[in-house]
């Protein structure tokens, strides 16, 4: 069984906890209770393979950035969530993505962009096209979800697992190439008996 450390990041109030609870327990939590930190574990099957997902739901508030940064350092894949009904949450994504790369000290990480609350289309402030364009700029997958209506909830987590798998395979491939190129070429020695 493969283990994955997945982290939800995004501004406060966008529905990170609701997505997580809907995925873990198949229920929708209506009231907003700001998260400091929560962790969950779920065993599931993705593309025919058994997976154990450790899911870390982080605080959106800047007051808890040290806790969030710790999860960023240890996480393998990131579900970055904004609300389609709140333009400011969308505007914060690029900064959050850059901060994540800085904390991880990497050029790229497995990352899925999620526009949540698509059931509230009449209050939409961020178009689907804007989400798709940002995902293209960030070179990541994009889905619109609704924790309330259970739209694309599981698929967003599964897509992130797929991205982590790709990154692991890419790292294994590059590590094996580095080992091959870093090894000095050994000359064959012959033994002469006199």
From Swiss-Prot:
It is a lipid-anchor. It is an enzyme of class 3 (hydrolase). One of its GO terms (molecular function) is GTP binding. It is found in: Cell membrane. Keywords: Cell membrane, GTP-binding, Hydrolase, Lipoprotein, Membrane, Methylation, Nucleotide-binding, Prenylation. SUPFAM superfamilies: P-loop containing nucleoside triphosphate hydrolases (SSF52540). GTP binds at residues 10-17, 57-61, 116-119. A motif (Effector region) lies at residues 32-40. Its EC number is 3.6.5.2. The modification Cysteine methyl ester is found at residue 191. SMART domains: RAB, RAN, RAS, RHO. A lipid is attached at residue 191 (S-geranylgeranyl cysteine). Residues 192-194 form a propeptide. One of its GO terms (biological process) is pinocytosis. Residues 168-194 are annotated as: Disordered. It catalyses: GTP + H2O = GDP + phosphate + H(+). One of its GO terms (cellular component) is plasma membrane. It comes from the Eukaryota. PANTHER family: RAS, DI-RAS, AND RHEB FAMILY MEMBERS OF SMALL GTPASE SUPERFAMILY. Ras proteins bind GDP/GTP and possess intrinsic GTPase activity. Belongs to the small GTPase superfamily. Ras family. This is Ras-like protein rasS. The lineage of its organism: Eukaryota, Amoebozoa, Evosea, Eumycetozoa, Dictyostelia. The gene is rasS.
């Amino acid at each position: 069984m493969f283990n994955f450390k997945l982290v939800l990041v995004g501004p406060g109030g966008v529905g990170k906890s609701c997505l997580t609870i809907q995925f873990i327990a198949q229920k929708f939590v209506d009231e907003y209770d700001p998260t400091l930190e929560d962790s969950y574990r779920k065993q599931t099957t993705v593309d025919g393979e058994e997976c154990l997902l450790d899911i870390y739901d982080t605080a959106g508030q800047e007051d808890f950035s040290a806790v969030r940064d710790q999860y960023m350092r240890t996480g393998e894949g990131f579900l970055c969530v904004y609300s389609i009904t709140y333009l400011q949450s969308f505007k914060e994504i690029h900064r959050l993505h850059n901060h994540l790369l800085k904390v991880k000290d990497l050029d790229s990480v497995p990352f899925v962009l999620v526009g949540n609350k698509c059931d509230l289309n009449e209050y939409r402030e961020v178009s689907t096209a804007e989400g798709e364009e940002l995902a293209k700029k960030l070179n990541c997958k994009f889905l619109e979800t609704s924790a309330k209506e259970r739209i694309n909830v599981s698929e967003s987590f599964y897509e992130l697992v797929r991205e982590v798998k790709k990154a692991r395979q890419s790292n294994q491939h590059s590590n094996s190439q580095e080992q091959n190129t870093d090894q000095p070429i050994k000359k064959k020695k012959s033994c002469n008996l006199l």
